[in-house]
Each structure stands twice: as C-alpha cells, then as structure tokens.
Regions:
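Short helix-coil boundary/hinge micro-motifs
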Residues: 1-31, 57-66, 116
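Short, charged surface segments at domain edges that flank catalytic/cofactor-binding sites
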Residues: 2-3, 37-69, 89-92, 96, ...
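Low-complexity, intrinsically disordered short segments enriched for Gly/Pro and polybasic residues
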Residues: 50, 78-81
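Histidine-centered catalytic micro-motifs used for acid/base chemistry in nuclease
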Residues: 71, 80-86
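Short, cysteine/histidine-rich loop/knuckle motifs that typically chelate Zn2+
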Residues: 71-72, 104
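Short Cys/His-centered divalent metal-binding micro-motifs
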Residues: 78, 98-116
C-alpha cells in the first residue's frame, strides 16, 4: 500500500520515520490539537482494517436503510456505494454520506459531475 493511499483510507497524515524502517507516525487533528502516535507495521495494518471495517458496516447499514435498492432508480441489482462528499474532499464513511446506487446510476452521477 502506498503512503498516499493509506492517508486517503485513514484520513490521517502518515509519515515514515527514518530511524526505524517500517514504523509510521499517524496523526490526526482533534479540534485544534494534533495527536501523533508512532505505530509499527502490524498496528498500521490493524488501523487499515478498522477503516475498512467501519466502511463495510456503514455501507451495509446504508443499503438496509434504503431497502437494498438504488436511491435513484430503485433497482435492486448491481448496487454500489456512492460517497455524496468524496473522501478526497473531506467526506467520511459515515452513513449520512453514503448513498446506495446501482452501477448505471453511479456511472451517470460521476459523468454529470465531470461535465459541470
């Protein structure tokens, strides 16, 4: 996994520490305070698994809330999760930011956004 991808997945800034190869610092802002913690590779993998786990649980909950149907056309096949506000723009994996859509509607959403 690349550093950039890990930062995107976790929402944390990740820097490799020079003295100990394989160690990472993980930092996040809480209010106006920066919390930084050094973690090893195993902890980093656990953090990544936690982020994926949260996404999985919230995705399923969003699907359930919508009756396992596309929020746009109400189809029930080929469902995907659309982030209303992208992670790259500060969006989260919170349920209110997730929208279940079918593959066709998902493509259409992104096509419309690119054309604006």
């Amino acid at each position: 996994m690349t550093k950039k991808r890990a930062e995107r997945l976790t929402g944390y800034e990740i820097r490799e520490l020079p003295p100990e190869r394989g160690m990472f610092t993980v930092g996040a802002f809480e209010g106006d305070q920066l919390i930084v913690k050094a973690v090893g590779h195993a902890d980093f993998l656990a953090l990544r698994a936690l982020v994926h786990g949260v996404y999985f649980v919230h995705s399923r909950k969003a699907m359930e809330q919508n009756g396992w149907r596309c929020a746009r056309c109400r189809a029930s096949r080929h469902l995907e999760i659309h982030h209303r506000k992208y992670r790259s723009h500060g969006g989260t994996h919170r349920i209110e930011n997730l929208e279940p859509v079918c593959r066709d509607c998902h493509k259409l959403i992104h096509r419309e956004e690119r054309s604006q």
